[in-house]
Amino acid sequence: MKIGIVGLGRVGSSTAFALLMKGFAREMVLIDVDKKRAEGDALDLIHGTPFTRRANIYAGDYADLKGSDVVIVAAGVPQKPGETRLQLLGRNARVMKEIARNVSKYAPDSIVIVVTNPVDVLTYFFLKESGMDPRKVFGSGTVLDTARLRTLIAQHCGFSPRSVHVYVIGEHGDSEVPVWSGAMIGGIPLQNMCQICQKCDSKILENFAEKTKRAAYEIIERKGATHYAIALAVADIVESIFFDEKRVLTLSVYLEDYLGVKDLCISVPVTLGKHGVERILKLNLNEEELEAFRKSASILKNAINEITAEENKHQNTGG
């Protein structure tokens, strides 16, 4: 598998390392506006290949993406302490459009995973600018949020996170929606399990949801950025592609019409295999969850409209 990574900040470089450890890539091209940074990362990773599976890793340009099976986009300006993901939109949209033009030119048949925040909006801009197959362009979405929530529940209840089944959908950010109505542990509905183990109630579950939502902010306050967990999440996404696992993951995908949400990239459960997104699964949400999901979609739609209006303004004024 040939993998291209655009953007070698902490997320991009951590992702490259995670992929090397997984052993998927026979070839990995690293692209960054700071060519020396990309060269340094390539050398550092190459020196680790005696301890991993052999891989050809090098710094390159967009033209070197030719023949890539997967392209991971992690380029963008970093999130500041206290800054919401949506506030990042204006500073990253133009960067994403430029990347989209280059990826579609040199690797039009690749599967593209957008990681840069705000991931839902930037995935939408990438898709529209590139004109690529919507099944092959998606964002990392709420894969990490889902993992965080499962971990919190598992730690509290004394189970493995792998035995906890609950999804976080919607925006990867402040308006994300935990789907409690479909949550299960070992095949037992979470509400029933709570009655059995008597370790939690609705307030504790709400606290878990809030902790999941605030997790990135908490980490950023302490160390400036999140990068290890998201890198592992992206490597997990690539694993599903590489092995054609057809796993169900909450990715930010383009929706033509999903529970009333149209023309938007937002996280919902999908099956992912070697050809990209194969199926979009419609959840049976309760009224409260459906309302929250549509509200989340509305927030993202407004953000897209705002940045589009600003772009048009710049073009009309020659800015």
Curated annotation (Swiss-Prot):
Catalytic reaction(s) noted: (S)-lactate + NAD(+) = pyruvate + NADH + H(+)
Keywords on record: Allosteric enzyme, Cytoplasm, NAD, Oxidoreductase, Phosphoprotein
Top-level EC class as recorded in UniProt: oxidoreductase
InterPro entries in alphabetical order: L-lactate/malate_DH (IPR001557), L-lactate_DH (IPR011304), L-lactate_DH_AS (IPR018177), Lactate/malate_DH_C (IPR022383), Lactate/malate_DH_N (IPR001236), Lactate_DH/Glyco_Ohase_4_C (IPR015955), NAD(P)-bd_dom_sf (IPR036291)
The keyword Oxidoreductase is annotated on this UniProt entry: yes
Chain sites annotated for binding NAD(+): V11, D32, R37, Y62, G76, V77, V115, T116, N117, S140
Cross-referenced Gene3D superfamilies: Lactate dehydrogenase/glycoside hydrolase, family 4, C-terminal (3.90.110.10), NAD(P)-binding Rossmann-like Domain (3.40.50.720)
Record-level GO cellular component terms: cytoplasm
Activity regulation text: Allosterically activated by fructose 1,6-bisphosphate (FBP).
Annotated positions of the Phosphotyrosine modification: Y217
EC assignment: 1.1.1.27
Residues that, per the record, bind beta-D-fructose 1,6-bisphosphate: R150, H165
Primary location class: cytoplasm
GO terms of biological process kind: glycolytic process; lactate metabolic process
Pathway where it operates: Fermentation; pyruvate fermentation to lactate; (S)-lactate from pyruvate: step 1/1
PROSITE patterns xrefs: L_LDH
Catalytic residues as annotated in Swiss-Prot or TrEMBL: H172
Family indicated by similarity: Belongs to the LDH/MDH superfamily. LDH family.
Function: Catalyzes the conversion of lactate to pyruvate.
Complexes and interactors: Homotetramer.
Protein name from the UniProt record: L-lactate dehydrogenase
Species, as recorded: Thermotoga sp. (strain RQ2)
